Amino acid sequence: GHPIAHDRWPALRDRLAACRSIALYDIDGFAEGFAEIHNIADLPIGGVYVQDIARIGTRVLGHKAQPVTDLASSDADIVLVATFDSDRAASHIAHLLPEGAEMANLDEIRLPDEMLTNRRRYLDPINFATNFAFFRDADGHHTRLVTANYWAGYGAEGVALWCRLFG
């Protein structure tokens, strides 16, 4: 995950951890990949719900995937829609929420819009044109980074470089 998204995760995680039971709606199949990046093993996930009928009955995060239409009969006090750009998915299941349940989604941890090229489709590959550089600063050796603004060649304006150093 991106370091900024990682920095936003604790607030959502705390909100989920405070719940009695979470219904996880894995509409796009992101839940297991997300769980590999963010530790969710100790969250009170009461059930996993899917829309794709081919996934019903499969194991997702140790739970037998149930059809999203069964969501209303869960005892969850929060439904986590495990996707980005979740407005449409959330509106499609709003009538299925258990009584009194609130909804959460991964949009709560997304990068700020000013860092995105395509703000309408968060997971568009253009938003994550990422390069990694490993720097050395020891024993008289140093790394120098030189770059070029190739985005201008594609018509981009106001291009910025964002870096985060880890020590």
Model-derived regions, located:
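Extended intrinsically disordered, low-complexity coil regions enriched in Ser, Thr, Gly, Ala
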Residues: 147-167
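Contiguous beta-strand segments within globular domains
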Residues: 139-144
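Hydrophobic, well-ordered beta-alpha structural blocks that scaffold small-molecule cofactor pockets
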Residues: 1-131, 135-137, 148
